[in-house]
């Protein structure tokens, strides 16, 4: 596939030249690769995008981020197994790409098709608790924008804080509370590059309303309405699970599910003008009382992910198909 540049990639309107020169990226300790502890350069991300596009047949239309246990097991029924004509590339083989270190996160990009529609899936995301700054956790989102996606589907494993939620439920995310942002930890912190998006992007409509309506209709078609919810998600830094006091505070401010990802990815995606749909698989009941028996653990998260693989595979497949249909009718 021919290399891309800032003038012809995707929607040209989203890649206007920056109004003024940005500060140079400090390459000290970076071997001159344009990515350091201080951030990234647009040109370096473009190089990553071209590296990937030179190895695939089709530009993907939709990007998918697979949550814990939902894309990491390449076997029948898994979310990632939905992709046909798959081309897999390890993060370790992609120049300047981070590497996932968490069990249940396989660590590769998978290019291929779902229902004949070109997609790219992340089998393994990057977390703040792994030692990565948030901008680097979200680097793949910017790269996916550059390789052509218009829509990002984000999945995560989350604790159910809403007392009506049960383990195994699927929560459509309608909004989030950026708890990490309250302390100034934001993926957009630092110099802004207007070739990606504006300095102050709005977040009041971060999760596409039409996609959420489609998802509810699909749940009805699949006869899984009884396990599909809609609510508010929040992300904490981890890696420890939350205290009883922390969970009760979150419950008071309207949080329905809590995890360690997604929010910063969605902020970055919206900054890049990507449409977003997100869902949480409720993998454990949050411990909101000192008298409750049991504690959250990562093995439980993976077990529930495996349990719901078939449901998620069908759900996401139909969602990809419907999203593509409605987006094709957009002017």
Segments from the language model and where they lie:
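Metabolite-binding pocket within alpha/beta catalytic cores that recognizes anionic/polar moieties
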Residues: 2-203
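Short acidic/polar active-site loop segments enriched in Thr and Asp
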Residues: 150-151, 256, 275
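Active-site rim beta-loop-alpha module in soluble metabolic enzymes
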Residues: 202-249
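Zn-dependent metallopeptidase/amidohydrolase metal-coordination segment
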Residues: 260-300
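His/Asp/Glu-rich mid-to-C-terminal helical/loop segments that flank catalytic regions of hydrolases
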Residues: 287-331
């Amino acid at each position: 596939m021919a290399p891309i540049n800032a003038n012809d990639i995707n929607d040209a309107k989203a890649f206007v030249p920056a109004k003024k020169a940005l500060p140079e990226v400090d390459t000290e300790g970076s071997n001159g690769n344009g990515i350091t502890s201080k951030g990234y350069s647009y040109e370096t991300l473009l190089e990553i995008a071209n590296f990937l596009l030179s190895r695939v047949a089709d530009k993907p239309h939709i990007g998918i981020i697979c949550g814990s246990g939902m894309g990491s097991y390449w076997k029948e029924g898994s979310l990632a197994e939905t992709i046909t004509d798959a081309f897999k590339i390890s993060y370790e083989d992609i120049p300047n790409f981070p590497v996932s270190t968490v069990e249940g996160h396989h660590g590769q990009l998978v290019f291929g098709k779902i229902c004949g529609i070109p997609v790219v899936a992340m089998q393994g995301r990057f977390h703040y608790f792994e030692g990565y700054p948030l901008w680097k956790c979200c680097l793949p989102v910017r790269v996916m924008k550059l390789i052509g996606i218009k829509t990002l589907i984000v999945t995560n494993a989350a604790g159910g804080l809403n007392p009506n939620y049960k383990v195994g439920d699927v929560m459509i995310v309608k909004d989030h509370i950026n708890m990490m942002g309250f302390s100034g930890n934001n993926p957009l912190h630092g110099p802004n590059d207007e070739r990606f998006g504006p300095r102050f992007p709005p977040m009041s409509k971060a999760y596409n309303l039409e996609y959420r309506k489609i998802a509810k209709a699909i749940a009805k078609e699949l006869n899984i309405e009884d396990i599909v919810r809609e609510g508010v998600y929040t992300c904490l830094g981890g890696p420890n699970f939350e205290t009883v006091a922390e969970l009760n505070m979150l419950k008071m401010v309207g949080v329905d599910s809590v995890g360690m990802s997604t929010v910063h990815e969605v902020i970055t995606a919206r900054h890049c003008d990507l449409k977003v749909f997100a869902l949480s698989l409720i993998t454990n009941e949050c411990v909101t009382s000192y008298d409750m028996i049991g504690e959250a653990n990562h093995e439980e998260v993976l077990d529930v992910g495996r349990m719901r693989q078939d449901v998620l595979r069908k759900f996401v497949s139909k969602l990809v198909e419907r999203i593509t249909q409605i987006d094709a009718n957009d002017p």
